[in-house]
Amino acid sequence: MGKVLGIDLGTTNSAMAVFEGNEGKIIANKEGRNTTPSVVAFTDKGEILVGDPAKRQAITNPQKTIYSIKRIMGLMMSEDKAKEAQKRLPYKVVDRNGACAVEIADKVYTPQEISAKILMKLKEDAEAYLGEEVSEAVITVPAYFNDAQRKATKEAGTIAGLNVLRIINEPTSAALAYGLDKKHAEKIVVYDLGGGTFDVTVLETGDNVVEVLATGGDAFLGGDDFDNRIIDWAAKEFEAENGIDLKKDVMALQRLKDAAENAKKELSSANETEINLPFITADATGPKHLVKKISRAKFESLIDDLIEQTIQKIDFVIKDAGLAKSDIAEVVMVGGSTRIPKVQQRVKDFIGKELNKSVNPDEVVALGAAIQGGVLKGDVKDVLLLDVTPLSLGIETLGGVMTKIIDRGTTIPVKKSQVFSTAEDNQPAVTIQVLQGERELARDNKSLGMFELSGIPAAPRGVPQIEVTFDIDANGILTVSAKDKATGKSQEIKITGSSGLSDSEIEKMVKDAELHKEEDSKRKSMIEAKNQADSLLYQTEKSLGEFKDQLEESERTKIESAINDLKETLKKENLTKEEIDEKVKALTEVSHKLAEAMYKKENPQAADAQQGNTANAGKKKDDDVIDAEVE
């Protein structure tokens, strides 16, 4: 039975782990790092780069480099956060069936497709590490993600070729990784501040149970926003001095973004750092340089209101759980942004407890997801996760009112029903508008979907009985059904969130992903073949220059001819790997005499001995053959 991959699909970085040897174990990517930048880039040559290679070229290719895609997962273009994303992101955020998507070189990609490319990279690197195929995963999401965002995350996994066994909340996952389920019963706060999202969750843990009591947060608050405060400050200072707005220059903005992120990280350990960007722009007077010192105190003043927003959320969630700060036994810090000293100090001062920072905040969520994978596979016994729905769910009723069917904080999975009736005499159909949120009026809440139950027999208003059922599975994904109790007619909608993707579109994307996988594999093989050919040419030409006097002219001519053949082949436009391999093989074969000449010069006695032993060389048994490479 294959291993389940635990994935923390982050805004800034992603991480993966498996359950091995009775514990979660982080898997490094092919670059040897425990985290992979959640960045995807499209090059002018048609290549798709993911992770570190994509991040490295972002400065020179800002409009085709996608980062922070998690910020627009499941987001509608009509939402304020979409408008904010359009202002902040250097790539084009466009409308696709009402949902946010990105446009690269006249092609539109959904956030699910971009996220799938990150997941594919993680999947491939995990398979290389484990030496076996990985087809199942547990993926984490912020506790405050709504239905649309959860569904979009699951769709991304499907497109990447993963069977997503479970979507679980990041704080719950962190609690598992910290082993808090093994302690005596106590109430804890998980404070999770990542690159783009913030969650705070109160859990009751102990006796192998992790139960969510209350959760809150902001799906659009994190380290990216801290970076943006530095960017805004530096750009404003630069404009005041030079009269040039750097935010209108996408390449300058990308350089400033990288510098701001580095400055933020450095200020976690230093009291002051410098943003130094030579030749950031130019005008009629010549090139301009951005050189600014920023102190930790200045940085803290820039982000103080953002930190206070997180403190207010802690207060709200503790009260929502019916608790006081004195009831909290432990505070667990999760997410890279919790490394900021001011964040740690404010949380510690507010709750009045020392912070638990015993696990790497960048890795803890993926570790917990791997443990949950072990639970689902039966490798981990007696652990029970009791997650809750973060927002109330209901339908629109007469007068545009939101009538709640499942209240916020209800433990999932859950199934609840309510009976409704018609608003008019002889009403033949009812429209069910599914809503998520805490406001009293339907228009102030998020619409998750709409469907119609028709064929209701003629009857006075208030007589027909329409049973509406809300069913939330363990992933937090919702199915809503409506049934006319008189006729037994029913209609249901599996809420696809506002992802804007139909099942057929997801299926097409899965096939496209497989298709690109083959293309990518061919492209990679071609690059490797070219590299091998270049290396062989270099070594052969170098050796020929050194040892040509020890070769007969006919042998030298053969080698030179094979070198030229390979060089000409590499210049061809529509080159195949087979053509390269053929010419490489030819050059390798004619170069044998050159190798003999080299060996003879270096070790003449051994060469003579070798000549004498040639007759016996073919008599070695297969068992004696050692296949190895020497560096």
From Swiss-Prot:
Q: Which InterPro entries match?
A: ATPase_NBD (IPR043129), Chaperone_DnaK (IPR012725), Heat_shock_70_CS (IPR018181), HSP70_C_sf (IPR029048), HSP70_peptide-bd_sf (IPR029047), Hsp_70_fam (IPR013126)
User: Which GO molecular function annotation, any one, does this entry have?
Assistant: ATP-dependent protein folding chaperone
Which UniProt keywords are present, listed alphabetically?
A: ATP-binding, Chaperone, Nucleotide-binding, Phosphoprotein, Stress response
Report the PROSITE patterns cross-referenced here. HSP70_1 (PS00297), HSP70_2 (PS00329), HSP70_3 (PS01036)
Under what conditions is it induced? By stress conditions e.g. heat shock.
| Residues annotated with Phosphothreonine modification | T197
- What is the annotated signal peptide range for this record? none
Matches recorded under NCBIfam families = PRK00290.1, PRK05183.1, prok_dnaK
Function per UniProt: Acts as a chaperone.
Q: Which PANTHER family match?
A: HEAT SHOCK PROTEIN 70KDA (PTHR19375)
The identity of this protein, by name, is Chaperone protein DnaK
Q: Which organism's genome codes for this protein?
A: Wolinella succinogenes (strain ATCC 29543 / DSM 1740 / CCUG 13145 / JCM 31913 / LMG 7466 / NCTC 11488 / FDC 602W)
Please name the gene that encodes this protein. dnaK
